[in-house]
From Swiss-Prot:
Function, in words: Regulates expression of genes involved in acid-resistance and biofilm formation. May be a non-specific DNA-binding protein that binds genes and/or intergenic regions via a geometric recognition.
Subunit description: Homodimer.
Protein name: Regulatory protein AriR
Entry keyword DNA-binding: yes
Gene Ontology biological-process entries: cellular response to acidic pH
GO molecular function annotation: DNA binding
Domain of life assignment: Bacteria
Keyword DNA-binding applies: yes
């Protein structure tokens, strides 16, 4: 996975990036999930915007069979949705 600074700089929604950056260890697992989603988007050449992050997280949620991991993905998705404008 890419370095945290690179991941946060790639996120187009700076308020979302700042929220995760300032959370410290409170959202450690969620930050890792977000980081993986952003890394996947960057490696595939997609724009790192909220819409694509949401789609990536939904895909991860649909494909995991691990209940605990699904819960972390769901929490991450909820946070991203809070920072997403209604007019997507």
């Amino acid at each position: 996975m890419l370095e945290d600074t690179t991941i946060h700089n790639a996120i187009s929604d700076k308020a979302l990036s700042s929220y995760f950056r300032s959370s410290g260890n409170l959202l450690e697992e969620e930050s890792a999930v977000l980081g993986q989603a952003v890394t996947n988007l960057m490696l595939s050449g997609d724009n790192v915007n909220n819409k694509n992050i949401i789609l990536s997280l939904i895909h991860s949620l649909e494909t995991t069979s691990d209940i605990l991991k699904a819960d972390v993905i769901r929490k991450t998705l909820e946070i991203v949705l809070r920072y997403t404008a209604d007019d997507m």
